[in-house]
A protein has these predicted regions:
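Residue-level preference for short coil/turn positions at secondary-structure junctions
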Residues: 18, 124, 220-223
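Aliphatic-rich helix starts adjacent to a transmembrane/signal segment
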Residues: 2-5, 11-71, 75
Length: 246
């Protein structure tokens, strides 16, 4: 009898202990899941913050490089080369790649070919300018340049003497425009081909100043260009002042 009671008591203790252990295990698993969920949420938040910071850093880098290129090209163009002076855009003419050559034989009125020292690397449809004796003639190429020959679209209306300097004249424009989603961007256009410099900006503003520090709207009087760019979601305004070469 005693042995039976002892056995039944032992069985009850075993069941109780087993039940308690199972409950403890379930609580431990639940606590572990809560900790795991919190950890995953923290990791996700950290990842999103990291990616946002990376995008902001990349955007700032794009802006810095874009403004450096704008400054270099405006300085290369110099005073008197501006073609567009607007609040949201600036346009100018410049020989961006330094292509130049010299006429080796006089070209008469009506000719469409210029004999030059070296015409290689001069692309079809580019604008060129020939200068001599304080006079310049603007022309357009009909085809890619050859080793000693440049072919122009229209017959010459005036003679060009031997020794005249010839150079490429690129048409450059920096401007802001929204894409199909309404995101404002800063773009660079060279001879009709445009590329995006900086995406997701809040504002781009150009202003123009003469040698006396007065705001002007006539391209011929501009001696200094100021560009201001505000990046979206960052509250950062970047200002670049560019003095033009005279």
């Amino acid at each position: 009898m005693r042995s039976g009671r002892q056995a039944r008591g032992m069985h009850r203790r075993i069941r109780t202990e087993a039940g308690t252990s199972l409950i403890e295990l379930m609580f431990a698993m639940a606590a572990g899941l809560v900790v795991l969920g919190a950890t995953l949420q923290a990791l996700s938040s950290f990842q999103q913050q990291f990616m946002r910071q990376q995008r902001e850093v990349a955007q700032q880098q794009d802006l810095r490089i874009g403004l450096e290129v704008l400054e270099q090209e405006l300085r290369l163009a110099g005073s008197g080369s501006l073609t567009t002076v607007a609040l949201d855009s600036v346009g100018f003419s410049a020989n961006l790649h330094g292509l130049s050559t010299t006429v080796t034989a006089a070209a008469a009125i009506g000719q469409t070919a210029l004999s030059v020292e070296d015409g290689r690397g001069w692309e079809d449809r580019k604008t060129i300018v020939a200068c001599w004796a304080e006079r310049c003639e603007t022309l357009a190429l009909a085809r890619d340049g050859q080793r000693h020959l440049l072919t122009i679209r229209q017959p010459l209306t005036g003679a060009i003497p031997s020794g005249a300097a010839v150079s490429i004249l690129n048409h450059v424009r920096y401007y802001s425009r929204r894409d199909d989603q309404g995101v404002l961007r800063l773009l660079r256009q060279v001879d009709g081909g445009a590329s995006v410099l900086v995406r997701d900006i809040q504002e781009v503003r150009f202003s123009y100043w003469d040698e006396m520090g007065q705001a002007v709207t006539q391209p011929a009087f501009v001696k200094r260009v100021v560009v201001e760019v505000m990046l979206s979601h960052q509250g950062i305004r970047t200002v670049r002042e560019i003095s033009l070469r005279t």
